[in-house]
């Protein structure tokens, strides 16, 4: 049997599986060291490449998975703003951390979800209502650049969507987190925020 994975490993396999050039480079680096305790020279080189390539990036930090990255982003947003609530898209996925889970899931306690607010994708009226009601408590708004639920069709942002979101977040001291784990470099090598016309100047905060 032959199988065609149209989901591309949930996003990152944009060059396909068993790509000989990529596999060779990965094996070469593996032989030089795997899971080292401190940054290796190649990690520094990659960080410099990323910050040069992504206009709004002042620095790069590596994590072992997307959930670690989004969790750290949430922590930074809370520390920066002094606020606690998280605003996200219904059915959006940003990892397996407690704040991302359905409150009825086994092992999830009330405190995991009581600081989380959810709105529908592409609904600016609903977004504005949340900001009006909870803006002083919301630390961040986290979303993928376009909606790509697991078992439904993807949906692009409507015209002006992200510019409106960015403006409202800036006005209300809300950190805007664009989760590019599944979409990064697929839309634009500078990051999907570039294609969405977000962050028109370096270092938006």
Where are each of the predicted segments found?
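Helix C-cap/helix->beta junction micro-motif
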Residues: 80, 171-172
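Surface-exposed amphipathic alpha-helices with a cationic face
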Residues: 162-170
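A glycine- and small-aliphatic-rich helix-loop capping segment at beta-alpha/alpha-beta transitions
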Residues: 20, 78-83, 101-107, 160, ...
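Active-site flanking residues adjacent to catalytic metal/cofactor-binding acidic residues
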Residues: 4, 89, 178-179
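Conserved PLP phosphate-binding loop immediately N-terminal to the Schiff-base lysine helix
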Residues: 144-158, 174-196
């Amino acid at each position: 049997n032959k199988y065609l994975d149209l989901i591309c490993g949930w996003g990152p396999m944009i060059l396909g599986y068993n790509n000989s050039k990529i596999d060779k480079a990965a094996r070469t680096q593996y032989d030089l060291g795997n899971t080292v305790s401190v940054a290796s020279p190649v990690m520094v080189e990659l960080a410099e490449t990323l910050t040069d390539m992504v206009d709004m990036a002042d620095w790069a930090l590596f994590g072992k998975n997307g959930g670690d990255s989004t969790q750290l982003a949430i922590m930074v947003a809370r520390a920066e703003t002094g606020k606690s609530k998280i605003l996200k898209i219904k059915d959006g996925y940003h990892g397996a951390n407690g704040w991302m889970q359905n409150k009825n899931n086994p092992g999830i306690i009330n405190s995991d979800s009581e600081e989380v607010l959810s709105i529908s994708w592409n609904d600016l009226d609903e977004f504005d209502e949340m900001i009006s009601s909870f803006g002083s408590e919301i630390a961040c708004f986290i979303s993928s650049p376009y909606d790509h639920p697991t078992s439904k069709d993807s949906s692009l942002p409507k015209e002006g969507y992200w510019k409106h979101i960015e403006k409202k977040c800036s006005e209300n001291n809300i950190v805007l987190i664009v989760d590019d784990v599944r979409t990064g470099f697929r839309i634009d090598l500078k990051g999907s925020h570039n294609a969405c016309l977000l962050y028109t100047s370096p270092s938006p905060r």
